[in-house]
């Protein structure tokens, strides 16, 4: 994901691929959540 731009759908998909529960955008960054 480019700096200053976060796609919530792409972020969620990437996080789930890494074994996380979900992904969300915070301060334009992709954050992964394990719960």
UniProtKB/Swiss-Prot annotation:
A GO MF label: toxin activity
Keyword field contains Disulfide bond: yes
An annotated GO cellular component: extracellular region
Residues in the signal sequence: none
Cell compartments where the protein resides: Secreted
Keyword match Signal: no
Disulfide bonds: 6-25, 11-30, 15-32
Expression by tissue: Expressed by the venom gland.
Stated family: Belongs to the short scorpion toxin superfamily. Potassium channel inhibitor family. Alpha-KTx 21 subfamily.
Free-text function comment from the UniProt entry: Toxin that blocks voltage-gated potassium channels (Kv).
Entry text on domains: Has the structural arrangement of an alpha-helix connected to antiparallel beta-sheets by disulfide bonds (CS-alpha/beta).
Protein name: Potassium channel toxin
Organism: Tityus metuendus
């Amino acid at each position: 994901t480019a700096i200053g731009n976060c796609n919530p759908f792409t972020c969620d998909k990437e996080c789930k691929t890494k074994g996380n529960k979900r992904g969300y955008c915070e301060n334009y960054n992709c954050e992964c959540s394990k719960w």
